[in-house]
Amino acid sequence: EGETEQCNCGGYGCLEQAASATGIARLARKLLEADLARPSSLREVKNLSAKSVLDAARAGDLLALESVETSCRYLGWAMAGITMVVDPEAYLIGGGVSRAGTFLTEKIQRYHDQLSPMATKKAKVLLATLGNDAGIYGAAKLVLG
């Protein structure tokens, strides 16, 4: 969508810019800046984070919900493209955003299913059981063999 901000990796238009914890907060920030008259409880938050956006979305804040929906749409649609080629059984959502639970996975699943109706089986969007600790376990496994 004509992304002008550079991603942490140095690229532009990366999925990470929208479909991640930092992406959710970034999208909310952009929405707040785009319409200064639009009401949102997020205007009172000093350090905007994915958690604050997700909490506001759960509480019914429409701007926060738009940010979350946009992030889930990008991720769900990207997964749908992968599903049509690879046909996986499941996708695991981990990291910090996994704490949002089914509030996120149900939205991601809905967007995924919109664009993958021809897949031989429906890939499930699930929560990784290790949550934000997955990286630590992976690093330990590499070191310990």
Residue locations for each model-derived region?
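ATP-binding/phosphotransfer module of carbohydrate and carboxylate kinases, centering on a glycine-rich
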Residues: 2-145
